[in-house]
């Protein structure tokens, strides 16, 4: 039996609210801003913490081929709904902290879209995820992260340690709650 994405979201939220890090799934306006710089013909894209698939749907709507999109989701409740909703997209149940060891399996990526709640994570976990993500990104690639705060949810110490910079792309006031989107890239590029 199919489980609706919202049922999966609220089940996960009730079970582990800090792990989910949101009170409702991200909205369409946020999804459009998060994916606005990713060209459909650019290459492979990795999505971390896709949840109900709002960013996934936006990427596919922009024309990204399903074969070029891989979703990494740890929460068991989201796996089957994602596979049912996006049957041609690769969905991996994996901890994003393991990205650095997945290069052979995942290959190089042109972009990473992250829905992970970094504000609820220890700094060493954020460092492992972002550092692992950049080990997969091609030169010139970017890591897109949203946050409900005004500043980037990747701490400045982590950015500095990894040789990265964060630039705010915009704020979506009509999201619940309002959210900011950041593009994280290598300093030398």
Please give the residue ranges for each predicted region.
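S-adenosyl-L-methionine
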Residues: 1-40
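Conserved beta-strand signature within the Rossmann-like core of class I S-adenosyl-L-methionine
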Residues: 137-148
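Conserved SAM/SAH-binding beta-strand->alpha-helix loop
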Residues: 75
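Core SAM-dependent methyltransferase catalytic element
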Residues: 171-189
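A short glycine-rich, Lys/Arg-flanked "PGG" loop and its adjoining helix->strand segment in the class I
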Residues: 127-139
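Conserved SAM-binding loop
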Residues: 82-83
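Glycine-rich SAM-binding Motif I of class I
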Residues: 53-57
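Conserved class I S-adenosyl-L-methionine
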Residues: 42-51
């Amino acid at each position: 039996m199919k489980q609706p994405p919202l049922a999966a979201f609220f089940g996960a939220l009730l079970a582990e609210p800090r792990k989910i890090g949101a009170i409702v799934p991200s909205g369409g306006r946020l999804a459009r801003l998060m994916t606005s710089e990713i060209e459909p013909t650019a290459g492979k894209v990795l999505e971390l913490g896709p949840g109900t698939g709002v960013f996934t749907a936006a990427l596919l709507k922009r024309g990204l081929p399903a074969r070029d999109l891989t979703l990494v989701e740890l929460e068991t409740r989201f796996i089957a709904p994602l596979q049912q909703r996006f049957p041609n997209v690769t969905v991996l149940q994996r901890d994003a902290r393991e990205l650095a060891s997945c290069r052979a399996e995942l290959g190089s990526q042109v972009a990473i879209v992250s829905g992970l709640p970094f504000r609820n994570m220890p700094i060493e976990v954020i460092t492992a995820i972002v550092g692992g993500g950049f080990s997969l990104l091609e030169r010139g690639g970017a890591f897109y992260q949203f946050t409900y705060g005004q500043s980037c949810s990747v701490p400045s110490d982590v950015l500095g340690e990894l040789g990265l910079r964060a630039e705010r792309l915009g704020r979506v006031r009509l999201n619940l709650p309002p959210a900011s989107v950041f593009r994280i890239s290598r300093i030398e590029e």
